[in-house]
């Protein structure tokens, strides 16, 4: 007998407990009053657990959890293989995420199988992302956590152009801006960005080396990644010119949206609670940095 059947079929617990505690408190009169209160309690439980929406939401949550778990590791394998080779660092990162989630042996075996499936050339990444987006379309905070996990795994041994293309594909399928517009990732993305711009600068110098030195000095200069403070504002999703109240509201809103209990209610597998806590910690550190820098 499951929890729903217990409360639907067994409808007298409230009356018994009400009568017992009522009798202890006020004797026979208290027992009668306790039965009355317990009856309302029983009726409320029966009404709640008999409601078909309860069963629907419970089933939907299980579907979301399954889809999120499967997509997390299969897409992770796809991104790792996107540049042709899965490095030891990427394998270690995948194992680290499994350990953080405190997966059982069976769950780890499933996660490894999904990771390997994602590495295969015939893996249909578009179909996997479409299914995830369809199932989690009402849980955008879950999807944001999903892309955060994928980015974290992808950048462990450096971002290549192939990985960035794979990440952009993930982001756009799920309704997010491409990586170069995801300001909250710039702190890590900046090193790759500088390298690519330096290569382009060198290429321009070689291509136009026959021009005058003054013209050569006017060539393209690599851009520096934004500073840590700008990254903190980006994490809180506010403008660097935002005032104290705007920053505080954004901070509280993000804490609420990324609260582990809320994400679990939306369908986040309980094994991924550690990853949600990491996201909350990043938000808190960003807010602390802004307040300290601004003197708030």
Swiss-Prot record:
In alphabetical order, the GO MF annotations are: protein-folding chaperone binding
Is Cell inner membrane tagged as a keyword? yes
Q: Which residues cross the membrane?
A: 16-39
Report whether Membrane shows up as a keyword of the record: yes
* PROSITE patterns the record matches: DNAJ_2
GO annotation, cellular component aspect? plasma membrane
InterPro entries attached to this UniProt entry: DjlA, DjlA_N, DnaJ_domain, J_dom_sf, TerB-like
Main subcellular localization, coarse class? Answer: membrane
Q: What does this protein do?
A: Regulatory DnaK co-chaperone. Direct interaction between DnaK and DjlA is needed for the induction of the wcaABCDE operon, involved in the synthesis of a colanic acid polysaccharide capsule, possibly through activation of the RcsB/RcsC phosphotransfer signaling pathway. The colanic acid capsule may help the bacterium survive conditions outside the host.
Protein name, per record: Co-chaperone protein DjlA
Species this protein is from = Legionella pneumophila subsp. pneumophila (strain Philadelphia 1 / ATCC 33152 / DSM 7513)
- Annotated gene: djlA
């Amino acid at each position: 007998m499951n929890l729903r059947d217990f409360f639907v079929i067994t409808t007298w617990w409230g009356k018994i407990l009400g009568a017992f505690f009522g009798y202890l408190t006020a004797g026979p009169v208290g027992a009668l009053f306790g039965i009355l209160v317990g009856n309302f309690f029983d009726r409320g439980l029966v009404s709640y657990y008999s409601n078909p929406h309860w069963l629907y939401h419970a089933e939907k949550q299980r579907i979301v959890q399954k889809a999120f778990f499967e997509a997390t590791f299969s897409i992770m394998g796809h991104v790792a293989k996107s540049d042709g080779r899965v490095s030891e660092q990427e394998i270690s990162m995948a194992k680290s995420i499994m350990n953080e989630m405190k997966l059982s042996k069976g769950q780890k075996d499933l996660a490894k199988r999904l990771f390997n499936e994602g590495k295969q050339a015939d893996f249909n990444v578009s179909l996997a992302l479409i299914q995830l987006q369809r199932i989690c379309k009402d849980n955008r905070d879950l999807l944001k956590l999903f892309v955060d996990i994928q980015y974290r795994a992808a950048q462990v041994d450096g971002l290549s152009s192939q990985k960035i293309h794979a990440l952009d594909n993930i982001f756009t399928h799920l309704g997010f801006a491409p990586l170069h517009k995801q300001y909250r990732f710039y702190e890590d993305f900046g090193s790759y960005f500088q390298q690519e711009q330096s290569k382009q600068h060198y290429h321009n110098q070689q291509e136009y080396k026959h021009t005058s030195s003054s013209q050569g000095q006017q060539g393209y200069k690599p851009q520096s990644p934004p500073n840590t403070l700008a990254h903190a504002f980006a994490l809180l999703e506010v403008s660097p010119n935002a005032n104290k109240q705007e920053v505080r509201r954004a901070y509280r809103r993000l804490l609420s949206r990324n609260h582990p209990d809320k994400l679990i209610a939306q369908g986040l597998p309980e094994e991924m609670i550690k990853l949600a806590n990491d996201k909350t910690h990043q938000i808190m550190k960003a807010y602390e940095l802004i307040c300290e820098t601004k003197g708030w």
